[in-house]
């Protein structure tokens, strides 16, 4: 029995040595260790041995089984390594071939429009200044000549944090903060882009939106300078458009005006977008109120200035024909991939 066990294991080891694939190794395992395998049959025949030999032969049989199992595992591991090495060699990367570029995103339409606005005014000699979004009530209202009973100070229109702190409702506070640093020096030409917050939410309004404030101060600035600046801006942003200035009111400018351009959809002929008026409002503007200059440190008798403000979403909606402001914030790739 001992000789037979040794012979079976030697035959199995020879078969393994010649195995070149994992499939052949599995065939050897089944042939010798399977339910009907050679070694299995030998072990089952131990019952015919004399009782005195069974413990010795049983121990030897288990040792032979373990030896064969180890040989099978060793050969399988070796073949897997060789197979992996061959696969890697066949899949060698040719670094001279062009790679596959990852999908590149694009700029958000609001970022594109903001950058375009900034570049237009940078070309006119303006500088970019930013201010805090969490603002003091003084800079947001009082320093900008808002009376105590102005509707904008109502809790229904403004997000107040406490009696003196709020989320700014416009970027105009940057104007006063800048003047406090520059007064009495002139000239000053600044644009102030940033986020603002108002209690408003519908198809054309959002509780958070982006605005650009622009202002200039010098010794002899007139309404004509304001008009010339805005005419240039409209031409650069929208192309050749008719413009009109409508009298309006803002606490921090006097005189004040709303600025309209001929409809970007119908060209001024009248359509649903412009409510059949032929005009679309794009911004508010005016000459800086003397009181705003004085509280900021300027002598209103010696200097003057103009200011204007526009919503970036509003400009983008007009420029691209978008009719719902919520599209800018929905993160819908079907919309964003168009830009």
Curated annotation (Swiss-Prot):
This entry's comment on the bound cofactor is:
Binds 2 magnesium ions per tetramer.
Determine the domain of life of the protein's source: Bacteria
Cofactor names:
Mg(2+)
- Location within or outside the cell: Cytoplasm
Q: Which residues cross the membrane?
A: none
Per UniProt, what is one Pfam family of this protein?
tRNA-synt_2d
The entry lists its GO molecular-function terms as: ATP binding; catalytic activity, acting on a protein; magnesium ion binding; phenylalanine-tRNA ligase activity; transferase activity; tRNA binding
Q: Which keywords appear in this protein's UniProt record, sorted alphabetically?
A: Aminoacyl-tRNA synthetase, ATP-binding, Cytoplasm, Ligase, Magnesium, Metal-binding, Nucleotide-binding, Protein biosynthesis
Q: Which GO terms describe its cellular component?
A: cytoplasm
CDD domains, per the entry: PheRS_alpha_core
Tell me which Gene Ontology terms the entry assigns under biological process. phenylalanyl-tRNA aminoacylation
The enzyme's first-digit EC class, named in words, is ligase
Q: Which residues bind Mg(2+)?
A: 254
Q: Which reaction does it catalyse?
A: tRNA(Phe) + L-phenylalanine + ATP = L-phenylalanyl-tRNA(Phe) + AMP + diphosphate + H(+)
Q: Matching Gene3D superfamilies, A to Z?
A: Bira Bifunctional Protein, Domain 2
Under HAMAP family, the record lists:
Phe_tRNA_synth_alpha1
**Which family is annotated?**
Belongs to the class-II aminoacyl-tRNA synthetase family. Phe-tRNA synthetase alpha subunit type 1 subfamily.
Tell me which NCBIfam families the record gives: pheS
State the oligomer form and interacting partners: Tetramer of two alpha and two beta subunits.
Question: Can you name this protein?
Answer: Phenylalanine--tRNA ligase alpha subunit
The organism that produces this protein has a lineage beginning with: Bacteria, Bacillati, Bacillota, Clostridia, Thermoanaerobacterales
- What gene does the UniProt entry assign to this protein? pheS
């Amino acid at each position: 029995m001992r000789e037979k066990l040794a012979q079976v294991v030697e035959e199995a080891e020879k078969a393994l040595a010649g195995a070149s694939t994992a499939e052949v190794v599995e065939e050897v395992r089944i042939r010798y260790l399977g339910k009907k395998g050679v070694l299995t049959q030998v072990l089952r025949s131990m019952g015919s041995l004399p009782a005195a030999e069974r413990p010795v032969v049983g121990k030897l049989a288990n040792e032979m089984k373990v030896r064969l199992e180890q040989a099978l595992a060793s050969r399988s591991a070796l073949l897997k390594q060789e197979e992996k090495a061959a696969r890697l060699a066949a899949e060698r990367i040719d670094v001279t071939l062009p790679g596959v570029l990852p999908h590149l995103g694009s700029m958000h339409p609001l970022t594109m429009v903001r950058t375009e606005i900034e570049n237009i005014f940078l070309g006119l000699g303006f500088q970019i200044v930013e201010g805090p979004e969490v603002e003091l009530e003084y800079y947001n209202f009082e320093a900008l000549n808002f009376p105590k009973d102005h509707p904008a100070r109502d809790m229904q229109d403004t997000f107040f944090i406490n009696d003196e702190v709020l989320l700014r409702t416009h970027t105009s506070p940057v104007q006063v903060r800048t003047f406090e640093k520059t007064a009495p020096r002139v000239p000053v030409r600044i644009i102030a882009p940033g986020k603002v917050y108002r209690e408003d939410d519908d198809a054309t309004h959002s509780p958070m939106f982006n605005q650009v404030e622009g202002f200039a101060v010098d010794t002899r600035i007139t309404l004509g300078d304001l008009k010339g600046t805005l005419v240039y801006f409209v031409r650069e942003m929208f192309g050749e458009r008719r413009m009109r200035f409508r009298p309006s009111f803002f606490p921090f400018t006097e005189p004040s005006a709303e600025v309209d351009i001929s409809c970007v959809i119908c060209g001024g002929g009248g359509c649903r977008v412009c409510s059949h008026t032929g005009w679309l409002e794009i911004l508010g503007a005016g000459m800086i109120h003397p009181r705003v200059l004085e509280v900021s440190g300027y002598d209103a008798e010696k200097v003057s200035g103009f200011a204007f403000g526009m919503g970036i979403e509003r400009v983008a909606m007009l420029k691209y024909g978008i009719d719902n402001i919520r599209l800018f914030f929905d993160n819908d790739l079907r919309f964003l991939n168009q830009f």
